[in-house]
Amino acid sequence: FGSLLGICLLTQILTGLLLATHYTADTTLAFSSVAHTCRNVQFGWLIRNLHANGASFFFICIYLHIGRGFYYGSYLNKETWNTGVILLLTLMATAFVGYALPWGQMSFWGATVITNLFSAIPYMGQTLVEWAWGGFXGDNPTLTRFFALHFLLPFIIASLTLIHLTFLHETGSNNPLGVQSNCDKIPFHPYLSSKDILGFMIMLLPLMTLAMFSPNLLGDPENFTPANPLVTPPHIKPEWYFLFAYAILRSIPNKLGGVLALAASVLILFLMPFLHKSKQRTMTFRPLSQLLYWTLVANLLILTWVGS
């Protein structure tokens, strides 16, 4: 899935650059500039739909990639694993600030609710939120800085990816048995290159299908309404890939507790290398660990479903 993530990043940066050329980061113009891109720009609708749904595929790939790393004990390559978790956090930040850009109802309220979580930090919380917003509510300064961040972060992701790969290159890749694979090395081309191209096709075909036939399947209809600070949508919820964390946040009555649990649900990944106590690296021959692993997967799916 690593190669798929690379292709995702490339696609997102390309479509994103094309979108940025037609986008205006101003509260009065942002919504109509996106509408203009979809209506009047050559293939603007396709570029926008590919960019929006590409994010979903990016998250599908990264969750599968992490799950695979979990199952086969890849977290024992500590540097690779830690840079990977940092990559995940950066990706989440990028997706969050990007979702605010069309400045629809859900964009505005999602941004408001999530940035508001910083106010749970004792003493300095409220000041921090107002500093992040650039005012007393999400407004023009908020949108412009979110656009700047959304433009910058993917390039940071790209550079972190290089670091991630450099660390991986130190140890070489892992395999389902968790044994040395030096004797199994084969030329990259034509073997692995064709495997990668097959993966690209298997991913890009559903992406194109989704973008062409039902581009709004995963989006929220609230976002077709321009942002209005005076009207709160009936149910504020993030895109599906954040629902598990959002469900954790909302299930805890205390604000600070919820924020800590939300952060912990992702940051727990940093602890994985220290929690490995088995003599075997992978879960291939560890039925009990497998049971716990699939329980975790089921939990995440249930949380995602409950969060919606």
Curated annotation (Swiss-Prot):
Any one GO molecular function term: metal ion binding
One Pfam family this sequence matches: Cytochrom_B_C
Free-text cofactor note: Binds 2 heme b groups non-covalently.
Membrane topology: Multi-pass membrane protein
Native organism: Pitta sordida
A GO BP entry: mitochondrial electron transport, ubiquinol to cytochrome c
Family under the similarity heading: Belongs to the cytochrome b family.
Positions that bind heme b b566: H65, H164
InterPro entries named among the record's database cross-references: Cyt_b/b6_C (IPR005798), Cyt_b/b6_C_sf (IPR036150), Cyt_b/b6_N (IPR005797), Cytb/b6-like_sf (IPR027387), Cytochrome_b_C_euk/bac (IPR048260), Cytochrome_b_N_euk/bac (IPR048259), Di-haem_cyt_TM (IPR016174)
Protein's name according to its UniProt entry: Cytochrome b
Gene: MT-CYB
Miscellaneous notes: Heme 1 (or BL or b562) is low-potential and absorbs at about 562 nm, and heme 2 (or BH or b566) is high-potential and absorbs at about 566 nm.
